[in-house]
Amino acid sequence: MCNTPTYCDLGKAAKDVFNKGYGFGMVKIDLRTKSCSGVEFSTSGHAYTDTGKASGNLETKYKVCNYGLTFTQKWNTDNTLGTEISLENKLAEGLKLTLDTIFVPNTGKKSGKLKASYKRDCFSLGSNVDIDFSGPTIYGWAVLAFEGWLAGYQMSFDTAKSKLSQNNFALGYKAADFQLHTHVNDGTEFGGSIYQKVNEKIETSINLAWTAGSNNTRFGIAAKYKLDCRTSLSAKVNNASLIGLGYTQTLRPGVKLTLSALIDGKNFNAGGHKVGLGFELEA
């Protein structure tokens, strides 16, 4: 099993408790389905209640399992077209190669990335290269795992300026029901998170972040409680007195409803609170 996480997935359990089950200030619909020929369709639409702006996207995915190939096409209402071709676990177990391209017909702008990642039980590493003739940017990351401990490094190098534009470190520990994650970004941004699965129904998370040279410390607490196999409640609060509440209900297999609200605790009577509504449909 190649289960070492990527750098971006470090601390993911804590992030999920804070982010999943909420959709403040918008009405959102997600639809996923699969054709008889094996083509996967995914579409989503958002309407923001404060601005009235609406957006949407469509994604199709087709897998050729015998050759380890996956073809993905994307389109959104900004008229941006994306194509992704990936080859996984064929040249070597745990190796994934990807070509990701973007085309904007209105402006003729084209861009792309070459991606490579390699995962094993005790490490994972990867690199992305922008396809830009003026000077590509090279991204790289690596994560080492040993007896539950995780250490990661992430960087980006701007070849046009010949300097590092990103320099991040992370250290964490992962167990079955507990995760600890700390990180330092560019030597100026510091953060950490703790995830605890109390039991089969309750998950909790704590998040802390601050920036060097600033007194602005960000702190938050979040929890998720499963009432039953169909219903869950979510709540979170931060040091800015913003309170988030979420309710998720599986109405029937493949149909999920999410209600959420963001309350400004400092200005409770002044209004400005946000609500959200979401539907997820899968067939």
UniProtKB/Swiss-Prot annotation:
Sites where Phosphothreonine occurs are at 4
A Pfam family per the record: Porin_3
Instruction: Name the reaction it catalyses.
Output: chloride(in) = chloride(out); K(+)(in) = K(+)(out)
For this protein, the parts annotated as crossing the membrane are 26-35, 39-47, 54-64, 69-76, 80-89, 95-104, 111-120, 123-130, 137-145, 150-158, 163-175, 178-185, 189-198, 202-211, 218-227, 231-238, 242-251, 254-263, 273-282
Gene Ontology BP terms: sperm mitochondrial sheath assembly; spermatogenesis
Its keywords, alphabetically, are: Acetylation, Ion transport, Isopeptide bond, Membrane, Mitochondrion, Mitochondrion outer membrane, NAD, Nucleotide-binding, Phosphoprotein, Porin, Transmembrane, Transmembrane beta strand, Transport, Ubl conjugation
Q: For this UniProt entry, what's an example GO CC term? A: membrane
What family does the database annotate?
A: Belongs to the eukaryotic mitochondrial porin family.
For this protein, the record's PANTHER family field holds: VOLTAGE-DEPENDENT ANION-SELECTIVE CHANNEL, VOLTAGE-DEPENDENT ANION-SELECTIVE CHANNEL PROTEIN 3
- Give the record's subunit note: Interacts with ARMC12 in a TBC1D21-dependent manner. Interacts with MISFA.
Name used for this protein in its record = Non-selective voltage-gated ion channel VDAC3
